[in-house]
Amino acid sequence: MGEEKRGPEVAPLSFPDLSLALPYQDALLYAQNRLKMIARGGLLPFCEAHKFPYTTIINLKNGNLKKEEPRLLHRLLRSLDVQNELLQFPPDSPSQRFLLPDGEALATFQLQMAYFKAAN
């Protein structure tokens, strides 16, 4: 009898801490402000390095997206060093949320958002 091959150990999927979930609009506003911080001429190299569609990122930055782009925003936040996971909650909601890993990440996000709101 052959020995059964097993893959790497996979952690069970636990129930998410919903207090760490950001609404789509908050994540979008954060990303727009962070993109506006990139110096003139720096956005194209950023997009090329992270394999983002330049025109779509420009539209996101300027608030001209035709529809919500949660997967793009998820990738963009990760490229801006905001670790997150997409979360569909409530389950029948048309918008997704962005789950931060811990309270420290949430506090950092809130602090940076407060800075953006004060600057605008």
Task: Describe the residue ranges of each PLM region.
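Recognition helix of helix-turn-helix/homeodomain-like DNA-binding domains
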Residues: 51-67
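Short, charged recognition helix plus adjacent turn
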Residues: 5-7, 88-120
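A short, Lys/Arg-rich alpha-helix, primarily the initiator
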Residues: 2-45, 49
